[in-house]
Amino acid sequence: MVDVELVDIKGMSDTSLKKFMQENSISLKNEEARRIVNLIGRNPTLTEIHIFNIQWSEHSSYKSSRPILKTLPTKAPNVILGPVEDSGIVELGKINGEKYGIVVSHESHNHPSQVVPYEGAATGIGGIIRDVLCMGAKVIATADPLRFGNPFGKNKNHVKYIANEVINGIAGYSNAVGIPNLAGDVYFNESFDDNCLVNVVCLGILKEKDIIHSYAPKDAEGYDIVIVGKPTDNSGFGGAAFASLILDEEAKESNRGAVQVPDPFLKNVLIRATYEVFNEAKKQNVKLGFKDMGAGGIMCSTSELCSDGDYGAEIDLDKVHISMDIPSFMIAVSETQERFTWISPKRFTPSILKIYNEDFELSNVAEGAKASIIGKVTKSQDYLLRHKGKIVCNAPIKAITSGISYDRISKKPNRKFKEPIIKEKNDY
Protein backbone atom coordinates (compact mmCIF):
# COMPACT_ATOMS: atom_id res chain seq x y z
CA MET A 1 0.00 0.00 0.00
CA VAL A 2 1.43 3.37 -1.10
CA ASP A 3 0.03 6.42 0.69
CA VAL A 4 0.06 9.10 -2.01
CA GLU A 5 -3.52 10.35 -1.75
CA LEU A 6 -3.89 13.65 0.07
CA VAL A 7 -6.18 13.67 3.10
CA ASP A 8 -8.62 16.58 2.74
CA ILE A 9 -8.17 18.06 6.19
CA LYS A 10 -9.11 21.49 4.84
CA GLY A 11 -12.50 20.26 3.69
CA MET A 12 -13.40 18.17 6.74
CA SER A 13 -15.71 19.36 9.47
CA ASP A 14 -14.44 19.05 13.04
CA THR A 15 -16.68 16.03 13.56
CA SER A 16 -15.46 14.30 10.39
CA LEU A 17 -11.84 15.08 11.18
CA LYS A 18 -12.12 13.69 14.70
CA LYS A 19 -13.71 10.51 13.33
CA PHE A 20 -10.94 10.16 10.72
CA MET A 21 -8.30 10.47 13.44
CA GLN A 22 -9.94 7.80 15.57
CA GLU A 23 -10.34 5.40 12.64
CA ASN A 24 -6.65 5.75 11.76
CA SER A 25 -5.30 5.53 15.35
CA ILE A 26 -4.06 9.12 15.26
CA SER A 27 -4.00 11.06 18.53
CA LEU A 28 -3.62 14.57 17.10
CA LYS A 29 -6.19 17.13 18.11
CA ASN A 30 -8.21 18.80 15.34
CA GLU A 31 -6.32 22.07 15.68
CA GLU A 32 -3.00 20.21 15.48
CA ALA A 33 -4.08 18.40 12.31
CA ARG A 34 -5.07 21.70 10.72
CA ARG A 35 -1.74 23.12 11.79
CA ILE A 36 -0.01 20.58 9.53
CA VAL A 37 -1.82 22.07 6.52
CA ASN A 38 -0.50 25.52 7.40
CA LEU A 39 3.04 24.23 7.92
CA ILE A 40 3.42 22.37 4.62
CA GLY A 41 1.06 24.56 2.58
CA ARG A 42 -1.31 21.79 1.45
CA ASN A 43 -3.32 18.81 2.62
CA PRO A 44 -0.99 16.04 3.87
CA THR A 45 -0.66 12.40 2.88
CA LEU A 46 -1.53 9.73 5.44
CA THR A 47 2.19 9.09 5.93
CA GLU A 48 2.78 12.77 6.71
CA ILE A 49 -0.07 12.78 9.23
CA HIS A 50 1.43 9.77 11.01
CA ILE A 51 4.83 11.48 11.02
CA PHE A 52 3.48 14.59 12.74
CA ASN A 53 1.40 12.41 15.06
CA ILE A 54 4.62 10.85 16.34
CA GLN A 55 6.74 13.99 16.35
CA TRP A 56 4.09 16.06 18.13
CA SER A 57 3.38 13.47 20.80
CA GLU A 58 4.37 14.24 24.38
CA HIS A 59 6.83 11.35 24.25
CA SER A 60 8.76 12.82 21.31
CA SER A 61 8.29 16.58 21.60
CA TYR A 62 7.92 17.13 25.37
CA LYS A 63 5.30 19.67 24.34
CA SER A 64 3.98 20.09 27.89
CA SER A 65 7.15 19.62 29.92
CA ARG A 66 9.74 21.35 27.73
CA PRO A 67 9.14 24.86 29.14
CA ILE A 68 9.63 23.49 32.66
CA LEU A 69 12.64 21.34 31.76
CA LYS A 70 14.37 24.40 30.31
CA THR A 71 14.46 25.92 33.80
CA LEU A 72 16.72 23.13 35.10
CA PRO A 73 20.50 23.66 35.26
CA THR A 74 22.35 21.83 32.49
CA LYS A 75 25.78 23.48 32.38
CA ALA A 76 28.73 22.96 34.72
CA PRO A 77 32.51 22.62 34.44
CA ASN A 78 32.24 18.83 34.46
CA VAL A 79 29.47 18.62 31.83
CA ILE A 80 30.98 17.54 28.51
CA LEU A 81 27.63 17.26 26.71
CA GLY A 82 24.30 18.50 28.04
CA PRO A 83 20.76 17.45 27.04
CA VAL A 84 21.00 18.12 23.31
CA GLU A 85 21.56 14.61 21.93
CA ASP A 86 20.62 11.02 22.79
CA SER A 87 22.62 10.99 26.05
CA GLY A 88 24.46 13.38 28.33
CA ILE A 89 28.16 13.09 29.14
CA VAL A 90 29.82 14.06 32.43
CA GLU A 91 33.58 14.21 32.95
CA LEU A 92 34.98 11.27 34.88
CA GLY A 93 38.62 12.35 34.96
CA LYS A 94 41.84 12.40 32.98
CA ILE A 95 44.24 9.54 32.35
CA ASN A 96 47.57 10.34 30.70
CA GLY A 97 46.17 13.71 29.68
CA GLU A 98 43.08 12.27 27.97
CA LYS A 99 39.66 13.26 29.28
CA TYR A 100 37.20 10.43 29.94
CA GLY A 101 33.46 10.82 30.31
CA ILE A 102 30.56 8.87 31.76
CA VAL A 103 27.65 8.72 29.32
CA VAL A 104 24.28 8.86 31.08
CA SER A 105 20.78 8.33 29.73
CA HIS A 106 17.46 7.64 31.40
CA GLU A 107 13.83 7.40 30.39
CA SER A 108 10.58 5.75 31.39
CA HIS A 109 8.64 2.89 29.82
CA ASN A 110 5.51 3.12 31.94
CA HIS A 111 2.54 2.53 29.64
CA PRO A 112 4.12 -0.38 27.75
CA SER A 113 5.05 -2.05 31.04
CA GLN A 114 1.53 -1.69 32.41
CA VAL A 115 0.00 -3.23 29.27
CA VAL A 116 2.60 -5.94 28.47
CA PRO A 117 4.96 -5.87 31.47
CA TYR A 118 7.68 -8.29 30.36
CA GLU A 119 8.10 -6.85 26.87
CA GLY A 120 7.51 -3.28 28.05
CA ALA A 121 10.28 -3.42 30.65
CA ALA A 122 12.66 -5.36 28.40
CA THR A 123 12.33 -2.89 25.53
CA GLY A 124 12.80 -0.04 28.00
CA ILE A 125 16.21 -1.47 28.87
CA GLY A 126 16.94 -2.15 25.20
CA GLY A 127 16.14 1.40 24.17
CA ILE A 128 18.20 3.06 26.85
CA ILE A 129 21.21 0.88 25.98
CA ARG A 130 20.95 2.08 22.37
CA ASP A 131 20.90 5.72 23.51
CA VAL A 132 24.25 5.30 25.26
CA LEU A 133 25.87 3.10 22.62
CA CYS A 134 25.12 5.54 19.81
CA MET A 135 27.28 8.22 21.46
CA GLY A 136 30.32 6.05 20.72
CA ALA A 137 30.50 4.67 24.26
CA LYS A 138 31.24 1.27 25.74
CA VAL A 139 28.07 0.34 27.64
CA ILE A 140 28.92 -0.67 31.21
CA ALA A 141 25.78 -0.73 33.38
CA THR A 142 22.02 -0.29 33.71
CA ALA A 143 19.77 0.63 36.64
CA ASP A 144 16.02 0.56 37.27
CA PRO A 145 14.03 2.73 39.74
CA LEU A 146 10.58 1.08 39.89
CA ARG A 147 7.17 2.01 41.32
CA PHE A 148 4.32 -0.50 41.64
CA GLY A 149 0.86 -0.59 43.17
CA ASN A 150 -0.14 -1.97 46.56
CA PRO A 151 0.66 -5.73 46.67
CA PHE A 152 -1.79 -6.19 49.55
CA GLY A 153 -4.62 -3.98 48.24
CA LYS A 154 -7.74 -4.64 46.21
CA ASN A 155 -5.71 -5.13 43.00
CA LYS A 156 -3.00 -7.22 44.67
CA ASN A 157 -2.99 -10.09 42.15
CA HIS A 158 -2.59 -7.81 39.16
CA VAL A 159 -0.02 -5.65 40.94
CA LYS A 160 2.08 -8.72 41.79
CA TYR A 161 1.82 -9.93 38.19
CA ILE A 162 2.99 -6.55 36.85
CA ALA A 163 5.87 -6.35 39.35
CA ASN A 164 7.10 -9.89 38.70
CA GLU A 165 6.93 -9.58 34.92
CA VAL A 166 8.64 -6.18 34.87
CA ILE A 167 11.51 -7.55 36.94
CA ASN A 168 11.70 -10.66 34.75
CA GLY A 169 11.75 -8.49 31.63
CA ILE A 170 14.60 -6.35 32.93
CA ALA A 171 16.58 -9.40 34.07
CA GLY A 172 15.91 -11.40 30.93
CA TYR A 173 17.06 -8.63 28.63
CA SER A 174 20.05 -7.50 30.69
CA ASN A 175 21.37 -11.04 31.15
CA ALA A 176 21.12 -11.90 27.46
CA VAL A 177 22.82 -8.66 26.43
CA GLY A 178 25.52 -9.18 29.05
CA ILE A 179 25.34 -5.76 30.68
CA PRO A 180 25.09 -5.75 34.50
CA ASN A 181 22.11 -4.16 36.23
CA LEU A 182 23.92 -2.46 39.09
CA ALA A 183 21.36 -0.34 40.90
CA GLY A 184 17.76 0.67 41.37
CA ASP A 185 15.03 0.89 43.94
CA VAL A 186 11.42 -0.16 44.30
CA TYR A 187 8.45 1.38 46.12
CA PHE A 188 4.87 0.17 46.40
CA ASN A 189 1.82 2.43 46.71
CA GLU A 190 -1.79 2.09 45.61
CA SER A 191 -1.45 5.24 43.50
CA PHE A 192 0.53 3.09 41.05
CA ASP A 193 -2.09 0.31 40.83
CA ASP A 194 -3.21 1.35 37.35
CA ASN A 195 0.01 2.84 36.03
CA CYS A 196 3.35 1.51 37.18
CA LEU A 197 6.51 3.55 36.73
CA VAL A 198 9.38 1.74 35.04
CA ASN A 199 12.36 4.07 34.86
CA VAL A 200 15.49 2.80 33.16
CA VAL A 201 19.03 4.17 33.33
CA CYS A 202 22.14 3.28 31.36
CA LEU A 203 25.80 4.23 31.78
CA GLY A 204 28.69 4.10 29.34
CA ILE A 205 32.29 5.24 29.23
CA LEU A 206 34.38 6.86 26.50
CA LYS A 207 37.20 9.25 25.73
CA GLU A 208 36.03 12.75 24.90
CA LYS A 209 37.77 12.59 21.52
CA ASP A 210 35.78 9.44 20.61
CA ILE A 211 32.29 10.97 20.95
CA ILE A 212 30.05 10.22 17.98
CA HIS A 213 27.31 12.80 17.59
CA SER A 214 23.62 12.32 16.85
CA TYR A 215 23.76 14.53 13.78
CA ALA A 216 25.23 14.47 10.29
CA PRO A 217 28.81 15.76 10.39
CA LYS A 218 30.18 18.77 8.55
CA ASP A 219 30.23 18.53 4.72
CA ALA A 220 27.91 15.50 4.77
CA GLU A 221 25.94 16.30 1.62
CA GLY A 222 25.64 13.07 -0.39
CA TYR A 223 26.55 10.84 2.56
CA ASP A 224 24.76 7.50 2.78
CA ILE A 225 21.94 6.85 5.22
CA VAL A 226 22.41 3.29 6.49
CA ILE A 227 20.03 1.43 8.78
CA VAL A 228 21.12 -1.60 10.80
CA GLY A 229 19.29 -4.32 12.70
CA LYS A 230 16.00 -6.19 12.62
CA PRO A 231 13.81 -6.00 9.54
CA THR A 232 11.05 -3.44 9.95
CA ASP A 233 7.66 -4.88 10.85
CA ASN A 234 4.43 -3.60 12.40
CA SER A 235 5.50 -4.10 16.03
CA GLY A 236 5.52 -0.98 18.15
CA PHE A 237 3.57 0.99 15.56
CA GLY A 238 2.33 4.19 17.20
CA GLY A 239 4.29 3.50 20.37
CA ALA A 240 5.34 7.12 20.94
CA ALA A 241 1.78 8.40 20.58
CA PHE A 242 0.49 5.58 22.81
CA ALA A 243 3.06 6.40 25.50
CA SER A 244 1.76 9.97 25.54
CA LEU A 245 -1.89 9.12 26.18
CA ILE A 246 -3.78 8.66 29.42
CA LEU A 247 -3.83 4.91 29.92
CA ASP A 248 -7.30 3.45 29.39
CA GLU A 249 -7.87 0.07 31.02
CA GLU A 250 -10.68 -0.75 28.56
CA ALA A 251 -8.40 -0.14 25.57
CA LYS A 252 -5.56 -2.24 26.96
CA GLU A 253 -5.94 -5.10 24.47
CA SER A 254 -6.00 -2.78 21.45
CA ASN A 255 -2.85 -1.07 22.72
CA ARG A 256 -0.77 -4.24 22.92
CA GLY A 257 0.39 -3.79 19.33
CA ALA A 258 1.99 -0.47 20.26
CA VAL A 259 4.44 -2.30 22.55
CA GLN A 260 7.69 -3.30 20.86
CA VAL A 261 9.07 -6.85 20.70
CA PRO A 262 12.56 -7.30 22.23
CA ASP A 263 15.42 -9.42 20.89
CA PRO A 264 18.30 -9.15 23.38
CA PHE A 265 20.39 -11.85 21.70
CA LEU A 266 20.45 -9.82 18.49
CA LYS A 267 21.24 -6.72 20.55
CA ASN A 268 24.24 -8.54 22.07
CA VAL A 269 25.67 -9.11 18.60
CA LEU A 270 24.72 -5.62 17.41
CA ILE A 271 26.64 -4.07 20.30
CA ARG A 272 29.78 -6.07 19.57
CA ALA A 273 29.54 -5.35 15.85
CA THR A 274 29.04 -1.65 16.54
CA TYR A 275 32.20 -1.56 18.67
CA GLU A 276 34.03 -2.84 15.59
CA VAL A 277 32.55 -0.03 13.49
CA PHE A 278 33.80 2.44 16.12
CA ASN A 279 37.30 0.95 15.88
CA GLU A 280 37.33 0.94 12.08
CA ALA A 281 36.13 4.55 11.93
CA LYS A 282 39.03 5.56 14.20
CA LYS A 283 41.52 3.72 11.99
CA GLN A 284 40.21 5.46 8.87
CA ASN A 285 39.73 8.81 10.66
CA VAL A 286 36.10 9.03 9.56
CA LYS A 287 33.45 11.30 11.08
CA LEU A 288 30.03 9.66 11.30
CA GLY A 289 26.56 10.43 12.56
CA PHE A 290 24.88 7.71 14.63
CA LYS A 291 21.50 7.46 16.27
CA ASP A 292 19.36 4.74 17.77
CA MET A 293 16.02 3.97 16.20
CA GLY A 294 13.40 4.29 18.92
CA ALA A 295 10.22 6.34 18.96
CA GLY A 296 9.18 7.18 15.40
CA GLY A 297 11.47 4.55 13.90
CA ILE A 298 13.20 5.30 10.61
CA MET A 299 11.48 8.66 10.23
CA CYS A 300 12.56 10.03 13.58
CA SER A 301 16.18 8.88 13.47
CA THR A 302 16.83 9.94 9.87
CA SER A 303 15.04 13.30 10.08
CA GLU A 304 16.75 14.28 13.34
CA LEU A 305 20.21 13.17 12.21
CA CYS A 306 19.93 15.28 9.06
CA SER A 307 17.99 18.23 10.49
CA ASP A 308 20.38 18.66 13.43
CA GLY A 309 23.25 18.88 10.94
CA ASP A 310 21.29 21.46 8.88
CA TYR A 311 20.62 19.05 6.03
CA GLY A 312 17.66 17.37 4.41
CA ALA A 313 17.16 13.71 3.51
CA GLU A 314 15.96 11.58 0.61
CA ILE A 315 14.90 8.05 1.51
CA ASP A 316 13.62 5.16 -0.61
CA LEU A 317 11.36 3.00 1.55
CA ASP A 318 11.73 0.16 -0.98
CA LYS A 319 15.33 -0.20 0.18
CA VAL A 320 14.31 -0.74 3.80
CA HIS A 321 14.59 -4.40 4.77
CA ILE A 322 11.14 -5.47 5.98
CA SER A 323 9.71 -8.74 7.28
CA MET A 324 6.17 -8.31 5.95
CA ASP A 325 4.20 -6.29 3.42
CA ILE A 326 3.23 -3.13 5.29
CA PRO A 327 2.06 0.32 4.13
CA SER A 328 4.30 3.32 3.63
CA PHE A 329 3.47 5.04 6.90
CA MET A 330 4.21 1.89 8.87
CA ILE A 331 7.62 1.40 7.26
CA ALA A 332 8.41 5.02 8.08
CA VAL A 333 7.35 5.19 11.73
CA SER A 334 7.08 1.64 13.10
CA GLU A 335 9.16 1.20 16.25
CA THR A 336 10.63 -2.22 15.54
CA GLN A 337 13.35 -2.85 18.11
CA GLU A 338 17.10 -3.45 17.77
CA ARG A 339 17.81 -0.91 15.01
CA PHE A 340 20.23 1.97 14.43
CA THR A 341 20.91 4.59 11.75
CA TRP A 342 24.33 5.66 10.47
CA ILE A 343 25.26 8.72 8.42
CA SER A 344 28.36 7.61 6.53
CA PRO A 345 30.61 8.91 3.75
CA LYS A 346 30.36 6.66 0.71
CA ARG A 347 33.97 5.53 1.06
CA PHE A 348 33.28 4.13 4.55
CA THR A 349 29.85 2.59 3.92
CA PRO A 350 31.30 -0.70 2.56
CA SER A 351 33.10 -1.15 5.90
CA ILE A 352 29.81 -0.76 7.80
CA LEU A 353 28.03 -3.24 5.53
CA LYS A 354 30.87 -5.75 5.77
CA ILE A 355 31.08 -5.65 9.57
CA TYR A 356 27.35 -6.18 10.14
CA ASN A 357 26.45 -8.39 7.17
CA GLU A 358 29.59 -10.51 6.75
CA ASP A 359 31.81 -10.38 9.82
CA PHE A 360 28.95 -10.65 12.34
CA GLU A 361 26.38 -12.21 9.98
CA LEU A 362 23.34 -10.53 11.48
CA SER A 363 20.99 -12.56 9.28
CA ASN A 364 22.14 -15.73 11.07
CA VAL A 365 21.29 -14.18 14.46
CA ALA A 366 17.81 -12.94 13.55
CA GLU A 367 15.95 -13.66 10.33
CA GLY A 368 16.20 -10.76 7.91
CA ALA A 369 18.49 -8.66 10.12
CA LYS A 370 21.18 -6.73 8.25
CA ALA A 371 22.58 -3.33 7.30
CA SER A 372 21.03 -1.55 4.29
CA ILE A 373 21.62 1.74 2.47
CA ILE A 374 18.22 3.45 2.26
CA GLY A 375 18.96 7.02 1.20
CA LYS A 376 21.23 10.02 1.23
CA VAL A 377 21.83 13.31 2.99
CA THR A 378 20.80 16.33 0.90
CA LYS A 379 21.65 20.01 0.91
CA SER A 380 17.96 20.96 0.73
CA GLN A 381 15.97 21.45 3.91
CA ASP A 382 13.33 18.92 2.84
CA TYR A 383 12.45 15.46 4.11
CA LEU A 384 11.52 13.30 1.14
CA LEU A 385 10.23 9.72 1.31
CA ARG A 386 9.53 7.61 -1.76
CA HIS A 387 7.74 4.27 -1.87
CA LYS A 388 7.30 2.21 -5.02
CA GLY A 389 8.48 5.18 -7.05
CA LYS A 390 5.96 7.62 -5.59
CA ILE A 391 6.47 10.45 -3.10
CA VAL A 392 4.66 9.75 0.18
CA CYS A 393 6.25 12.56 2.20
CA ASN A 394 7.73 15.88 1.12
CA ALA A 395 7.86 18.36 3.98
CA PRO A 396 10.30 20.89 5.45
CA ILE A 397 12.59 18.86 7.68
CA LYS A 398 12.65 21.51 10.42
CA ALA A 399 8.84 21.45 10.55
CA ILE A 400 9.04 17.72 11.26
CA THR A 401 11.76 17.88 13.91
CA SER A 402 11.04 21.13 15.77
CA GLY A 403 7.96 19.81 17.56
CA ILE A 404 5.34 21.96 19.25
CA SER A 405 5.05 23.42 22.72
CA TYR A 406 2.22 24.31 25.10
CA ASP A 407 2.18 26.49 28.18
CA ARG A 408 -0.12 24.37 30.33
CA ILE A 409 -2.21 25.80 33.14
CA SER A 410 -0.50 25.11 36.47
CA LYS A 411 -1.32 25.58 40.11
CA LYS A 412 0.51 25.27 43.39
CA PRO A 413 0.58 21.79 44.96
CA ASN A 414 -1.79 21.02 47.82
CA ARG A 415 1.04 19.81 50.04
CA LYS A 416 4.53 21.05 50.64
CA PHE A 417 7.41 18.63 50.99
CA LYS A 418 10.82 19.20 52.51
CA GLU A 419 14.02 17.31 51.92
CA PRO A 420 15.14 15.51 55.10
CA ILE A 421 18.24 16.79 56.84
CA ILE A 422 20.58 13.84 57.26
CA LYS A 423 23.49 14.29 59.60
CA GLU A 424 26.79 13.09 58.27
CA LYS A 425 28.69 10.57 60.36
CA ASN A 426 32.27 11.25 61.31
CA ASP A 427 33.22 7.69 60.51
CA TYR A 428 31.34 5.36 58.17
Annotate the PLM regions:
Residues 1-428:
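Glycine/proline-enriched, intrinsically flexible loops and inter-domain linkers
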